[in-house]
């Protein structure tokens, strides 16, 4: 593969992101003496210790967002607005930090968001239980008063990723790329607009959803379980949040929803968002030149996609 960053390159990128977060925090009046990197994959997540503030600095972005800082700012703005609103309703979330203005901050080529620091409790995740807890999150999000774009996590991401892979047979074999393009050509008309979705699935409700598997993004803290990482928050069907979660978790969601008299999952919609999620994994190979660990990390998802029948 060509153009793969060295460990030194990756460490330098992380250091730049940390420096930007520290500088932005200090400019906003925060005390920062001992910044700690909590996470470093698609974003560098920094605790600005001793302040109870965590900064998320995206460093590896899909091609469409990398080329459009305004779109990135808008997505971050949406996340802060939705999560701030949820916190005000008493929904268990990791909220935006109350110590700084609730707005993305641009510095040194990065755009970052500021969140309250929480103490993590190490615990084996129970995804079926987490899926059941997503029902209450969906009930709350159904009332969100703001306007959000429809299925924004798909818009530009899959098509642009496949475009990048067109010239990278070292990342994706031409036969795989041809299959992926064919599948996306069939899915895109359904997922690209509310109108296309409604035509295929008449009567299926669209609402505000988390956008990135809340069962996998439920954080266990010393003060309880908190929903987190709403970076892909969007308008869409509830099924989007249960994509690729598996039958046990799907059933747990349905049981919890039925007990409350709330909508259960539509398996037809779930099949479509599962197919799109598999294609997202394929398109994510376009990010390997920026994040080499993805090459290994994506293998299980790619094997699953190759083993599945092509999307009709």
List the predicted regions and their residue ranges.
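ATP/Mg2+ or Mg2+-diphosphate-binding catalytic cores
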Residues: 2-9, 152, 161-171, 283-312
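Active-site Asp-x-Gly
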Residues: 208, 219-271
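A glycine-centered beta->alpha junction motif in the catalytic cores
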Residues: 59-63, 108-124, 163-174, 278-296
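A conserved alpha-helical element in kinase catalytic cores
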Residues: 11-19, 57-108, 124-132, 136
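Catalytic-loop signature of eukaryotic-like protein kinases
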Residues: 212, 216-218
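ATP-binding glycine-rich phosphate-binding loop
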Residues: 28-49
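Juxta-kinase regulatory segment immediately upstream of eukaryotic protein kinase catalytic domains
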Residues: 1-32
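A cross-family kinase active-site recognition segment
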Residues: 2, 121-182, 206
């Amino acid at each position: 593969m060509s153009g793969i960053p060295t460990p030194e390159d990756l460490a330098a990128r992380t250091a730049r992101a940390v420096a930007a977060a520290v500088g932005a925090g200090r400019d906003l009046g925060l005390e920062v003496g001992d910044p700690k990197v909590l996470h470093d994959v698609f974003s560098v997540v920094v605790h600005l210790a001793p302040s109870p503030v965590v900064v998320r600095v995206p460093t590896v972005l899909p091609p469409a967002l990398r080329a459009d800082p305004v779109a990135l700012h808008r997505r971050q703005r949406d996340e802060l607005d939705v999560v701030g609103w949820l916190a005000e309703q008493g929904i268990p979330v990791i909220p935006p930090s109350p110590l700084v203005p609730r707005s993305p901050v641009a510095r040194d080529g990065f755009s970052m968001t500021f969140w309250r620091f929480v103490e993590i409790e190490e615990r084996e995740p129970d995804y079926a239980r987490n899926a059941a807890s997503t029902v209450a999150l969906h009930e709350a999000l159904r009332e969100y008063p703001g306007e959000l774009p429809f299925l924004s996590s798909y818009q530009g991401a899959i098509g642009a990723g496949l475009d990048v892979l067109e010239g990278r047979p070292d990342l994706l074999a031409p036969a795989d790329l041809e299959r992926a393009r064919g599948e996306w050509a069939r899915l895109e008309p359904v997922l690209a607009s509310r109108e296309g979705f409604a035509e295929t699935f008449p009567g299926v409700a669209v609402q505000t959803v988390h956008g990135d598997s809340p069962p996998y993004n439920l954080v266990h803290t010393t003060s309880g379980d908190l929903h987190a990482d709403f970076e892909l928050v969007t308008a869409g069907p509830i099924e989007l949040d249960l994509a690729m979660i598996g039958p046990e978790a799907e059933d747990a969601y349905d049981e919890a929803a039925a007990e409350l008299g709330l909508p259960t999952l539509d398996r037809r919609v779930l099949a479509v968002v599962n197919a799109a999620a598999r294609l997202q994994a394929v398109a994510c190979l376009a990010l390997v030149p920026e994040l080499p660990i993805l090459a290994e990390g994506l293998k299980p998802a790619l094997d699953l996609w190759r083993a599945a029948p092509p999307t009709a």
